[in-house]
């Protein structure tokens, strides 16, 4: 029978509930337990797919094609269990499901209310999500409840968790509350009152936390821990200090050293093997002792909010671990390149253009592509980054001066990139779209496998085929591919069913390392193994740096 750990947050948002939940899962997995995680988001949107990156940050895509919260990316990076659509749901999905049932007559004429109908539906979604775990029936399901205790939006979820805990009985569920212990510089001390009030608010709705994770910018002294214990009615050894660190991969060891996994296992009556966190220690050791150092420029329009590129940043960090390289990421606003030119890119060892939407800043990104191609600097284009690389090549090498995407210019006569109107999803069903289709849930999504052209750089990186996740509406137009190939561009991977270009590259005679991918490889990168594409990209940056140094010598 699956046991449940509910993770709640208090005082302020963005304290790191997702990292805390994922770290706990990593420790429990290291003890031989099968673990899955779920994220409950209180907003009314059906999913984050149409939300602005400035509002929500990154949208993480699962293997089965769900657009989900970025915390699911943390979950997959910390444990071996893969996430699915059922691992993340929102208030919007809950209400949509309940209203659909009411319209069908499932409630037999009853008045449909938040309690019991909404709360029952939340519990059903939780149990369904746990049951669908890719690891089989999990020993533990960790359920992260988004938002902050005291928010109106979170109340149905907290009430559902309380009811579920009561229904399952003692030792079948426990609550971990993440809270803030701020340091007041003028007073020169940490303040415990916000934590006391947050726990009090939680207890008012019938939930008494078993463990407190106290976030601060420094370790919390024993005196403050004792005060928190006394006023929160939580045992002193269950008040755990979680201070700021330079790498999130240090968190599992930090929590284990303070006995978090022991407390959870005791409360849930689990008796697993001892924890083995050597992998995490080795990762941190490699991260802190690099042999090389490179600077990679990430050119985008959301660079002021790096949460928009969370998985991409982590993928580069994973590559740094597995290539013994310190990777410095320099965030470059593409609109500044439009205004000021590309002179600011001259010191970079590699250029990366990530995915994105909309016309704003695209000409600056195209300028960055042109610089990387002409200067022979390693280039990686992801999703939109591949499309822009094709547009730049079409304009500046092939001579199609009006080449563009219909996303940016619907009337362009040279539609090098255009809307995909028909494709097969991962189950083999035909999907069709038009310019008038809804924005939400209408993209090509999820993992799809395709063969790789022999003798290419792509084959050297991936092998015979590639299986990566997608999130896009636009695709390189096959009508222009013969002209592009005549100019030297190589389409190194295509989908087997629709013949859509998946990867492009320049031959090594034209450029040492220039790759574009229509998919999002960052979603499958983990600290355990890294990712072959990002490892190759970082190695190319090292080679570029060394060649440049040799030329100067």
Swiss-Prot record:
A GO CC term assigned to this protein in UniProt: cytosol
Domain Glutamine amidotransferase type-1: 295-547
Gene Ontology process terms (BP): 'de novo' CTP biosynthetic process; pyrimidine nucleobase biosynthetic process
Binding annotation for CTP: 13, 151-153, 191-196, 227
Miscellaneous section: CTPSs have evolved a hybrid strategy for distinguishing between UTP and CTP. The overlapping regions of the product feedback inhibitory and substrate sites recognize a common feature in both compounds, the triphosphate moiety. To differentiate isosteric substrate and product pyrimidine rings, an additional pocket far from the expected kinase/ligase catalytic site, specifically recognizes the cytosine and ribose portions of the product inhibitor.
Summary of subunit composition and partner proteins: Homotetramer.
Molecular-function GO terms, alphabetical: ATP binding; CTP synthase activity; glutaminase activity; identical protein binding; metal ion binding
Amino acids binding UTP: 13, 191-196, 227
Pfam family, one: GATase
Record-linked PANTHER family: CTP SYNTHASE, CTP SYNTHASE-RELATED
Positions of L-glutamine binding: 356, 384-387, 407, 473
InterPro entries named in the record: Class_I_gatase-like, CTP_synthase, CTP_synthase_N, GATASE, GATase1_CTP_Synthase, P-loop_NTPase
Enzyme class (EC, first level): ligase
Reactions catalysed according to its record: UTP + L-glutamine + ATP + H2O = CTP + L-glutamate + ADP + phosphate + 2 H(+); L-glutamine + H2O = L-glutamate + NH4(+); UTP + NH4(+) + ATP = CTP + ADP + phosphate + 2 H(+)
Entry binding sites for ATP: 14-19, 71
Keywords, sorted A to Z: ATP-binding, Glutamine amidotransferase, Ligase, Magnesium, Metal-binding, Nucleotide-binding, Pyrimidine biosynthesis
UniProt: Mg(2+) binding residues: 71, 144
Superkingdom field: Bacteria
The enzyme's E.C. designation: 6.3.4.2
Pathway stated in the Swiss-Prot or TrEMBL entry: Pyrimidine metabolism; CTP biosynthesis via de novo pathway; CTP from UDP: step 2/2
Biological role stated in the UniProt entry: Catalyzes the ATP-dependent amination of UTP to CTP with either L-glutamine or ammonia as the source of nitrogen. Regulates intracellular CTP levels through interactions with the four ribonucleotide triphosphates.
Annotated protein name in UniProt: CTP synthase
Signal peptide: none
Phylogenetic classification of the source organism: Bacteria, Pseudomonadati, Pseudomonadota, Betaproteobacteria, Burkholderiales
Region (Amidoligase domain): 1-270
């Amino acid at each position: 029978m699956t046991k449940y750990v509910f993770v709640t947050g208090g005082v302020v948002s963005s304290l790191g509930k997702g990292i805390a939940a994922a770290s706990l899962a990593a420790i429990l997995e290291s003890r031989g337990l099968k673990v899955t995680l779920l994220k409950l988001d209180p907003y009314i949107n059906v999913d984050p797919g149409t939300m602005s990156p400035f509002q929500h940050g990154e949208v993480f895509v699962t293997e089965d094609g769900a657009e989900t919260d970025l915390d699911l990316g943390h979950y997959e990076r910390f444990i071996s269990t893969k996430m699915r659509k059922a691992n993340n749901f929102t208030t919007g999905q809950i209400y949509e499901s309940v209203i659909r049932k009411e319209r069908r007559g499932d409630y037999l004429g009853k008045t449909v209310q938040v309690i019991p109908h909404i709360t029952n539906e939340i519990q059903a979604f939780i149990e369904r999500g746990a049951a669908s775990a890719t690891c089989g029936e999990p020993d533990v399901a960790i359920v992260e409840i988004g938002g902050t205790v005291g928010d109106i939006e979170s109340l149905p979820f907290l009430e559902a968790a309380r009811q579920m805990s009561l229904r399952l009985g003692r030792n079948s569920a426990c609550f971990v509350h993440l809270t803030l212990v701020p340091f007041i510089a003028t007073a020169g001390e940490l303040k415990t009152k916000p934590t006391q009030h947050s726990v009090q608010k939680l207890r008012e709705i019938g939930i008494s936390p078993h463990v407190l994770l106290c976030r601060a910018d420094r370790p919390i002294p024993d005196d403050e821990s004792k005060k928190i214990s006394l006023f929160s009615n939580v045992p002193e050894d269950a008040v755990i200090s979680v201070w700021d660190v330079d790498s999130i991969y240090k968190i599992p060891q930090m929590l284990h050293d303070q006995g978090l996994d022991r407390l959870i296992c005791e409360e849930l009556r689990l008796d697993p093997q001892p924890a083995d966190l050597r992998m995490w220690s080795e990762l941190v050791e490699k991260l802190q002792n690099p042999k090389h150092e490179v600077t990679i420029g990430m050119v985008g329009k959301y660079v002021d909010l790096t949460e928009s590129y969370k998985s991409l940043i982590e993928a580069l960090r994973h590559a740094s671990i597995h290539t013994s390289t310190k990777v410095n990421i320099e965030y470059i606003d593409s609109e500044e390149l439009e205004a000021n030119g590309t002179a600011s890119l001259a010191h970079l060892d590699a250029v990366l253009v990530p995915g994105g939407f909309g016309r704003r800043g695209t000409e600056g990104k195209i300028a960055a592509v042109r610089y990387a191609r002409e200067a022979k600097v390693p280039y990686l284009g992801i999703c939109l980054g591949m499309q822009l690389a094709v547009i730049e090549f079409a304009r500046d090498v092939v001579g199609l001066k009006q080449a563009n995407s219909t996303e940016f210019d619907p009337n362009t006569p040279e539609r090098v990139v255009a809307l995909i109107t028909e494709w097969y999803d991962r189950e083999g069903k035909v999907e069709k779209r038009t310019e008038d289709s809804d924005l939400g849930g209408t993209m090509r999504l999820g993992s799809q496998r395709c063969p790789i052209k022999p003798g290419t750089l792509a084959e050297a990186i991936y092998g015979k085929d590639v299986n990566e996740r997608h999130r896009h509406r636009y695709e390189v137009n096959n009508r222009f591919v013969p002209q592009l190939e005549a100019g030297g561009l190589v389409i190194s991977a295509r989908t087997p069913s629709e013949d859509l270009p998946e990867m492009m590259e320049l031959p090594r005679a034209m450029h040492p390392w220039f790759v574009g991918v229509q998919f999002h490889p960052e979603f499958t990168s983990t600290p355990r193994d890294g990712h072959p594409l990002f490892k190759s990209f970082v190695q190319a940056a090292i080679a570029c740096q060394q060649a440049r140094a040799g030329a100067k010598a």
